[in-house]
Amino acid sequence: MRIVFLFFIFFSFSIQSQTLDYVFKSGEDGYKCFRIPTILKSQNGTLLAFAEGRKNSCSDTGDIDLVLKKSLDNGNTWSALNVIWDDGNNTCGNPSPVLDKKSGRISLLSTWNKGEDKEWQIIDQKVLILGEFF
């Protein structure tokens, strides 16, 4: 019983001492919401946080940009939001950064489709332009 009591005291203290900070927060920087976040640590230690910036809704279709924030202090603070790909009302999504450890080069793989294309149309290949990968 004593061990359980001490566990709860420690657990309660641990929860209370943590602060919660978001890299991307819905409703900020002109975006309704952010989805598909991913973080990569460069060879010089810079953290790069990528996400989809969804302008008008949290839907998987529509005006979606790729956005980036950087941290030089291991995530304690973050830069202002940078838009790295905005193709008007089209969907630029699924950011997937890859680090080449030999060269230090970072490649960002992503997808693109027309903003009015619905998910079921893309899956059934019923769109004029099939999604592109970059």
Question: What label would you give each PLM region?
Answer:
Residues 16-134:
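Asp-box/BNR beta-propeller blade signature and adjacent active/binding-site loops
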Residues 3-13:
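Sec-dependent N-terminal signal peptides
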